């Protein structure tokens, strides 16, 4: 984007924005929750809608002058309904966490019970962690993945639900590399008369493209982020059956938020339209193919993957066996110095702290947006392996950085008519 006016008004911010643009162009984004939106989405999110308050919903606003805002939100809803097939969709949440908050506010009372996946096993802060409002407001018990396989043990989850009797069971995760069997979790919820919240923040795009099974029509509530694998404007979304529509809408506004960020809603609408194009299905499948190629190549280098591989957009690497003296933090910092940006991550059975854990998480959505295929991701895996094998060797880091530079030049950002790399 052109920051000419920002440069005139605020050179310091303009410099930071330019630095971020250059950073994204010149490094490989492998944080599994990140992606590169199109220039069309960027423009929509920087539109004059940022000036407009639009409290309420289309046709029922608390302020005048909301005609264009109504048009934008209605288009976002219509496109979301076409993508995911839910009976009712609210596109106003500012984030995936606030989408989850809306469900809790709508359906639970303080002290009610939540059953969710343990954070170090791949869950999320907003699913009941003590540092989050959920852990401070509700009674939370958490399930874990099988320590031997790294998979969710659905039979064990069912038994745990019967013993705990939760009011809501949360599925959907931030660091779980396998396909989620939503129907199995729904069976556990039905057995104890609990609600089922499926948080698909990481896999919204995979679900929309049909390359991951959908919880819509299975779970009572489906929430997600709109800027990860779906590659739309930043924010959140809530989906539910029509019977819960009024409760959810009231929980979003005025329960959890005031005016929606209408410029972000515009970005959502544009991104949803892009995701309705045939090439998006090819993109989503390529994300998975790339993650599989990345993981398999890392295994060839001797790395251990949680669950032994991946079915989705991410791999979770457990360094304890292959590199017992190298923490996820050391690996993250060495890789960033080489131009590969991923994140340290806890692993099941974690023996270190969350700030210096034993694993790293790597995702392929942003690489795939740049046009990476399986062979390119294998090259990335080779670089990752070499750096982690030699995290303190400056020569290794310099060599890796040169390889990353070559990949960034080979697969530049914002190519093609849609503003992202086109897939034929």
From Swiss-Prot:
Compartments where found: Cytoplasm
Chief localization: cytoplasm
UniProt: (6S)-5,6,7,8-tetrahydrofolate binding residues: 119, 123-125, 353-355
GO biological process: glycine biosynthetic process from serine; tetrahydrofolate interconversion
GO molecular function: glycine hydroxymethyltransferase activity; pyridoxal phosphate binding
GO cellular component, one term: cytoplasm
Pfam family, any one: SHMT
Cofactor: pyridoxal 5'-phosphate
Catalytic reaction equation(s): (6R)-5,10-methylene-5,6,7,8-tetrahydrofolate + glycine + H2O = (6S)-5,6,7,8-tetrahydrofolate + L-serine
Pathway assigned in UniProt: One-carbon metabolism; tetrahydrofolate interconversion; Amino-acid biosynthesis; glycine biosynthesis; glycine from L-serine: step 1/1
Sites annotated Plays an important role in substrate specificity: 227
Family note: Belongs to the SHMT family.
Function in brief: Catalyzes the reversible interconversion of serine and glycine with tetrahydrofolate (THF) serving as the one-carbon carrier. Also exhibits THF-independent aldolase activity toward beta-hydroxyamino acids, producing glycine and aldehydes, via a retro-aldol mechanism.
Protein name from the UniProt record: Serine hydroxymethyltransferase
Native species: Natronomonas pharaonis (strain ATCC 35678 / DSM 2160 / CIP 103997 / JCM 8858 / NBRC 14720 / NCIMB 2260 / Gabara) (Halobacterium pharaonis)
UniProt gene name: glyA
């Amino acid at each position: 984007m052109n920051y000419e006016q920002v440069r005139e008004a605020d050179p310091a911010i303009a410099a930071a924005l330019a630095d971020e643009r250059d950073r994204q162009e010149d490094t490989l984004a492998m944080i599994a929750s990140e992606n590169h939106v199109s220039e069309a989405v960027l423009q929509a999110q920087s539109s004059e809608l940022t000036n407009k308050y639009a409290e309420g919903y289309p046709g029922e606003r608390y302020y005048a002058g909301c005609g264009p805002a109504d048009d934008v939100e209605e288009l976002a809803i219509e496109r979301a309904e076409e993508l995911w097939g839910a009976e009712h969709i609210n596109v106003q949440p500012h984030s995936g966490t606030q989408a989850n908050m809306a469900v809790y506010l709508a359906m639970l009372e303080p002290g009610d019970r939540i059953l969710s996946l343990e954070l170090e096993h791949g869950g999320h802060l907003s699913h009941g962690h003590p540092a989050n409002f959920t852990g401070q407001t509700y009674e939370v018990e958490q399930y874990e993945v099988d320590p031997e396989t790294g998979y969710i043990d659905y039979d064990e989850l069912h038994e745990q639900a019967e013993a705990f009797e939760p009011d809501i069971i949360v599925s959907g995760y931030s660091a779980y590399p396998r396909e989620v069997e939503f129907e199995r979790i729904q069976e556990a919820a039905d057995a104890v008369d609990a609600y089922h919240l499926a948080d698909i923040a990481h896999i919204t795009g995979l679900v929309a493209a049909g390359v991951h099974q959908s919880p819509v029509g299975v779970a009572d509530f489906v929430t997600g982020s709109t800027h990860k694998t779906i590659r739309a404007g930043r924010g959140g979304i809530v989906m539910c059956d029509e019977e819960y529509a009024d409760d959810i809408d009231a929980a979003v506004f005025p329960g959890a938020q005031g005016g929606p960020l209408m410029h972000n809603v515009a970005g959502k609408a544009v991104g949803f339209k892009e995701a309705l194009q045939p090439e998006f299905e090819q993109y989503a499948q390529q994300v998975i193919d790339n993650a599989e190629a990345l993981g398999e190549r890392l295994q060839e280098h001797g790395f251990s993957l949680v669950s032994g591989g991946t079915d989705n957009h991410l791999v979770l690497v457990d360094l304890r066996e292959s590199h017992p003296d190298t923490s996820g933090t050391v690996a993250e910092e060495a890789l960033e110095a080489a131009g590969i940006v991923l994140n340290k991550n806890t692993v099941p059975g974690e023996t270190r702290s969350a700030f210096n854990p034993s694993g790293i998480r790597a995702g392929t959505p942003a690489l795939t947006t740049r046009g990476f295929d399986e062979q390119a991701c294998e090259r990335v895996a080779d670089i990752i392996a070499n750096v982690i094998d030699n995290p303190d060797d400056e020569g290794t880091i310099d060599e890796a950085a040169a390889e990353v530079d070559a990949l960034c030049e080979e697969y530049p950002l914002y190519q093609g008519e849609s503003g992202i790399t086109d897939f034929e």
